[in-house]
């Protein structure tokens, strides 16, 4: 595995490669990232992993400065997963002039976009830059960040980016908690409460299977997510991947939640296909 910070150096290394699988991350890697790397390794000749804590996707009161970092551990996991090139750009590399950014026109007015204004502009800006640098054949994203994934798919379509976006399943702890770099923030009590998010989503699925109206399911889910010391950011259902309102013609529904614990904000979701 080679570690690089230079755009020119990485482009030269990738020139002429038949297929390149790419996983963009902010580091502090876990088993969820490892599953993306494993799939990329199986499907491509070359695997590129980027680690960059992107400042433009953090709001003024968010956790940019304390976002967990562990370069040595990340490098070990990347090496074990068979990564060929680990791209470690600096802010100056990624934002040399910072004169232009991507702006999201739709799909950021629901779910995380409501409480994190500008977040997805930052995400799509950095993803756009990384796609231009790496020029991958395939890029891998986890469904845990389902809204982000849908917006990236939309960006790729709107901008005619020649990359195949691969949706990858959510990887969970044994008790159902979705793997996340931010789980490390949780106190012991919060860690015991957190699996209740997935439990609430599974109860919602069972209710939908039984024919319970969607609005009733959302109300029931909100009621089941009232953990001590937490606030509910949202419990919403949107059509997927359009992120528009659910109506009678909607085949796939994204049921998504965000819960603010004292130590961390956790998100989770499920995709529900009507009639499946």
Swiss-Prot record:
Residues holding ATP: 26-33, 142-145, 171, 179-182
Keyword flag Ligase: yes
Annotated binding of beta-alanine, by residue: 57
Binding residues for (R)-pantoate: 57, 148
Pathway entry: Cofactor biosynthesis; (R)-pantothenate biosynthesis; (R)-pantothenate from (R)-pantoate and beta-alanine: step 1/1
Gene Ontology terms for molecular function: ATP binding; pantoate-beta-alanine ligase activity
GO cellular component term, pick one: cytosol
Alphabetically ordered keywords of this record: ATP-binding, Cytoplasm, Ligase, Nucleotide-binding, Pantothenate biosynthesis
EC number: 6.3.2.1
Family annotation (InterPro entries): Cyt_trans-like (IPR004821), Pantoate_ligase (IPR003721), Pantoate_ligase_C (IPR042176), Rossmann-like_a/b/a_fold (IPR014729)
Biological process, per Gene Ontology: pantothenate biosynthetic process
Catalytically driven reaction(s): (R)-pantoate + beta-alanine + ATP = (R)-pantothenate + AMP + diphosphate + H(+)
Major location category of this protein: cytoplasm
Catalytic residues of the enzyme: 33
Keyword hit for ATP-binding: yes
UniProt-listed PANTHER family: CYTIDYLATE KINASE/PANTOATE-BETA-ALANINE LIGASE, PANTOATE--BETA-ALANINE LIGASE
Other comment: The reaction proceeds by a bi uni uni bi ping pong mechanism.
Subunit: Homodimer.
HAMAP family xref list: PanC
Protein name, as recorded: Pantothenate synthetase
Species in which this protein is naturally found: Exiguobacterium sibiricum (strain DSM 17290 / CCUG 55495 / CIP 109462 / JCM 13490 / 255-15)
Gene this chain is encoded by: panC
């Amino acid at each position: 595995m080679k570690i690089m910070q230079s755009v020119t150096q990485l482009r030269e290394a990738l020139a002429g490669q038949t297929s390149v699988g790419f996983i963009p991350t902010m580091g502090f890697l876990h088993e969820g990232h490892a599953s993306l790397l494993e799939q990329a390794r199986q499907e491509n000749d070359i695997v590129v992993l980027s680690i960059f804590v992107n400042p433009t996707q953090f709001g003024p009161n968010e956790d940019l400065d304390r976002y967990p970092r562990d370069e040595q551990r990340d490098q070990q996991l990347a090496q074990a997963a068979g990564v060929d090139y680990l791209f470690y750009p600096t802010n100056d590399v990624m934002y040399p002039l910072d004169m232009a950014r991507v702006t999201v026109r739709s799909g950021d007015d629901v779910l995380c976009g409501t409480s994190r204004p500008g977040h997805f502009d930052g995400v799509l800006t950095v993803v756009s830059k990384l796609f231009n640098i790496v020029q991958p054949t395939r890029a891998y994203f986890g469904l845990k960040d389902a809204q982000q994934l849908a917006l990236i798919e939309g960006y790729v379509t709107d901008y005619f980016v020649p990359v195949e976006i691969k949706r990858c399943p959510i990887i969970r702890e044994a008790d159902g908690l979705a793997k996340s770099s931010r789980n490390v923030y949780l106190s012991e009590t919060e860690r015991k409460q957190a699996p209740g998010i997935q439990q609430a989503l599974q109860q919602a699925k069972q209710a939908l299977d039984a024919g319970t109206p969607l609005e009733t399911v959302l109300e029931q889910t909100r009621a089941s997510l009232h953990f001590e010391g937490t606030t509910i950011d949202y419990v919403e259902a949107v059509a997927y991947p359009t992120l528009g309102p659910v109506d009678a013609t909607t085949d796939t529904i994204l049921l998504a939640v965000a819960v603010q614990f004292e130590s961390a904000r956790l998100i989770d979701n499920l995709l529900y296909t009507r009639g499946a």
